[in-house]
Amino acid sequence: MGVTVIPRLLGLKDEKKIATTVGEARLSGINYRHPDSALVSYPVAAAAPLGRLPAGNYRIAIVGGGAGGIAALYELGRLAATLPAGSGIDVQIYEADPDSFLHDRPGIKAIKVRGLKAGRVSAALVHNGDPASGDTIYEVGAMRFPEIAGLTWHYASAAFGDAAPIKVFPNPGKVPTEFVFGNRVDRYVGSDPKDWEDPDSPTLKVLGVVAGGLVGNPQGENVAMYPIANVDPAKIAAILNAATPPADALERIQTKYWPEFIAQYDGLTLGAAVREIVTVAFEKGTLPPVDGVLDVDESISYYVELFGRFGFGTGGFKPLYNISLVEMMRLILWDYSNEYTLPVTENVEFIRNLFLKAQNVGAGKLVVQVRQERVANACHSGTASARAQLLSYDSHNAVHSEAYDFVILAVPHDQLTPIVSRSGFEHAASQNLGDAGLGLETHTYNQVYPPLLLSDSSPAANARIVTAIGQLHMARSSKVFATVKTAALDQPWVPQWRGEPIKAVVSDSGLAASYVVPSPIVEDGQAPEYSSLLASYTWEDDSTRLRHDFGLYPQNPATETGTADGMYRTMVNRAYRYVKYAGASNAQPWWFYQLLAEARTADRFVFDWTTNKTAGGFKLDMTGDHHQSNLCFRYHTHALAASLDNRFFIASDSYSHLGGWLEGAFMSALNAVAGLIVRANRGDVSALSTEARPLVIGLRPVVKVPAAELATSQ
């Protein structure tokens, strides 16, 4: 559910071979290194168990059954298999959501527009009265998977096998698409001018200008306006994705070039960068005046807003214009051409399969118990070798307290903040923890230390990580779905482009991006009878503007106070507008309004992440936020200071530099487990595999490592 940024989406349609299996996609992203951690390829680090644990029996908790938590479980399973006889790992997974796949029970799938969940990976099964034979699936979270997401495909390979088939996701621009912005209407597929209805479209021109200004050229002349180490970002992306780049080049990117770029541009918004690029292009004459009527300033603003709605062809970034250029550059450097769908009916199956594989690879030495409990507080408690403590409430609000050797907190930042902030930031002789403000029973702990312990003596150091987590920006996001007959696209009033009906719409109607996605539910090899109509996929302010129409949210089945039909009709109404197409003498009612109205009444559905318990869609850095995000990303390096005896680790896309993507959640899970291995081995990084060591020693430590412990951390 993250931000799709594909500068090459429209331009390189035929350059790269389309992957048809999980294994082919896995090879596409196996080498990629991110600029914040350029010294390590995460898929390579995860190719084998991350390291070894000392012999013994471990009791470990994972809080959260989403992608980060289950990936951490899988890695713990591989570690368990390496333990000697008589040793093992007992994992307790805390997951409060009754609809989680971890609590799968008869009846859940029978709920009309709700399905099983794996954290924010969730789907809604749509059926016409018979849940055993669904009509289509609404992929609420995690609906598409970039080819360069090497760790995602690594785990997909574990879950499904390399031979499992995959399909290209029908992104705007990959399928015939219509773009509507003010008086501007474009139909296109790809970015070759001959594949645009208007080869001289200002939309296509501003796309090329902004892509060049932000990305530049992979070879030849440097043209980007925001270079990294005086070269185009496209050239840096090529190094990061090379199979065998020079080690010194990667080190320079991570330790010099990328930090310099951050220092220079972390205070610059994406919107300001786009305006500067457009202004320079206009002054050079690359972009002409608009209609010869608007003056210079208004022409520049027109182009800035035009790109703001169009983006790189998959939907605009205007709602994200306040994010930092640094955050956008991370996504630009994550350079790819295609996104795919998985070989599943619903994407929750990916996480469920990985959960089952974790227990298989554990070779009988991994024991897993799932607890349907809500974790309210965490702390260290006890005298010497203080153990990690979790206080939780079950579905009847009975209080429970458990001690663990280690805890991985695998929940988004808005959920984590109250869990880790209640016990304060320094040692206390005794504390009463729990949700006393809700009138619930509490529990008394003695000799209490903060859960995210970074110092024995500095409350400010301990507060720093908690406040950093609390200040991360959570982007607002929402989706509105409906079900249509696939044959509806064959009606004569649905326009065609290049011999196919329009299947994606990007517009300023308030709906933002709209997709028609064929159902994964098919019979006897026939074409799917139904398709999911993602009527609206919005971010930030676009999402906020729709919220008053959502009725009973975040999930909107029919109720007495607000019906799904009433909610959906407001979406249809937004598309009722007059549009004038090229060559037409008059504006006519927009055909898309008619397609939206074709949807089945019973299956209209909205999911708004901001009003969901996750409190938002995905982490995204605003200007200045890099310093919070990066501290969270490096948090696991506290394990190098074994004498600190911190037993907590964090794992979520929120604590990565790829907020909203499974790849970010998986990366943070690897970080957490690598840190756990080092901590279990008293700071000895040689316990990690050679490939996994940069996960810890390749990053700047979040704590000062005492001189006596420094040798083992080298």
Swiss-Prot record:
Outcome (variant: R144A): Abolishes catalytic activity
Cofactor, free-text remark: Binds 2 FAD per tetramer.
Catalytic activity: L-phenylalanine + O2 = 2-phenylacetamide + CO2 + H2O
Post-translational modification summary for this protein: Proteolytically cleaved to yield the active enzyme. Cleavage of the linkage between the 2 subunits causes reshaping of the oxygen channel and the hydrophobic environment around the flavin ring. Removal of the prosequence causes opening of the amino acid channel.
Thermal characteristics: Optimum temperature is 45 degrees Celsius for the oxygenation reaction and 65 degrees Celsius for the oxygenation reaction. Stable up to 70 degrees Celsius.
Cofactor(s) required, per the database record: FAD
Residues that hold substrate according to the record: R144, Y537, G660
Residue numbers binding FAD: 2, 68, 95-96, 120, 141-144, 375, 652-653, 660-662
Subunit structure: Heterotetramer composed of 2 alpha and 2 beta subunits.
Protein name, entry field: Phenylalanine 2-monooxygenase precursor
Naturally occurring in which organism (per UniProt): Pseudomonas sp
